[in-house]
Regions:
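N-terminal subdomain of lithium-sensitive/metallo-dependent phosphomonoesterases centered on the IMPase/IPPase/PAP
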Residues: 1-83, 238-244
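Solvent-exposed alpha-helices and their adjacent loops that cap or buttress functional pockets
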Residues: 31, 70-72, 91, 119, ...
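An extended, acidic
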Residues: 134-247
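Small-residue (primarily alanine) positions within well-ordered alpha-helices
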Residues: 8, 12-15, 107, 206, ...
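Residue-level signal for inorganic ion chemistry
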Residues: 19-22, 43, 54, 86, ...
Length: 247
């Protein structure tokens, strides 16, 4: 493991301790942000401890976080989502994770309530709980599993019918959503995951892991980026077919 990945894994350990301490707590404090999405005291505590550690150990690096904003230090940026799927977390649904990325180079997704952690560093492959992972070899939509969050997420973009047309061509669909959809693609359990509206901190860690697992990761325009506002991850073999459905 390189030093940056080792650090990211330690950051994930700290995050897991906080999220599991507050998980299923009857006294968890939750409020609505300006965009009406929820944030809990655990989200803020996780991001604070990660930022404090990075300030000590990588003082020249910048940090972008969902809850506490961005700073412009350095050419390297750490991208943090303290709790991806906060809505699950506050309802005691165990599908949530802390996402930590050194932009383009390192990705860690830690889902302690699921007992799973995925990680990758550029050029070194992708892993889940220490086992190497690889995308599936399925090359036909007829045999593919397609994952997403919610059909209504496509409504503001006028693409719901296009998504449904693609879904009907696949073998099976599941609305797992958030990080888990993309990690299941990286593991080879599914072939395509699609999200029409997501932020950089939702995607930066996922992109590294999916690509290091042999998959392909783009926005809905086909650009290989985590800051395009949307995402398709795939096993690579079915990526063009998924993109074509939205054109």
């Amino acid at each position: 493991l390189n030093d940056d990945l080792r650090l990211a894994l330690r950051l994930a350990d700290s995050a897991d301790a906080i999220t599991m301490e507050h998980f299923r707590s009857a006294t968890l404090a939750v409020r609505a942000k300006a965009d009406a999405t929820p944030v809990s005291e655990a989200d803020e505590a996780v991001e604070r401890i990660i930022r404090e550690t990075l300030a000590r150990e990588r003082p020249d690096d910048g940090v972008v976080g969902e809850e506490l904003g961005a700073d412009a230090r350095g050419s390297r940026r750490w991208i943090i989502d303290p709790i991806d799927a906060t809505s699950n977390y506050i309802r005691a649904i165990p599908v949530f994770a802390t996402l930590i990325a050194l932009e383009h180079e390192v990705g860690v997704v830690s889902a302690p309530a699921l007992g799973r952690r995925w990680w990758a560093s550029r050029g070194d492959g992708a892993f889940c709980n220490g086992n190497r992972i690889r995308v599936s070899p399925i090359a036909s939509l007829d045999d593919a599993h397609l994952l997403y969050d919610s059909v209504k997420d496509f409504d503001p973009f006028g693409t719901s019918e296009r998504f449904l047309a693609l879904a009907r061509r696949t073998k099976r669909t599941r609305a797992f959503g958030d990080f888990w959809s993309h990690m299941l693609v990286a593991e080879g359990a599914a072939e395509i995951a699609i999200e029409p509206s997501v932020a950089l901190w939702d995607l930066a860690a996922l992109q590294v892991i999916v690509e290091e697992a042999g998959g392909r990761f783009t926005d809905l325009h086909g650009d290989a980026r985590a800051d395009g506002g949307s995402a398709i991850s795939s096993n690579g073999l079915l990526h063009d077919a998924a993109l074509e459905a939205f054109r």
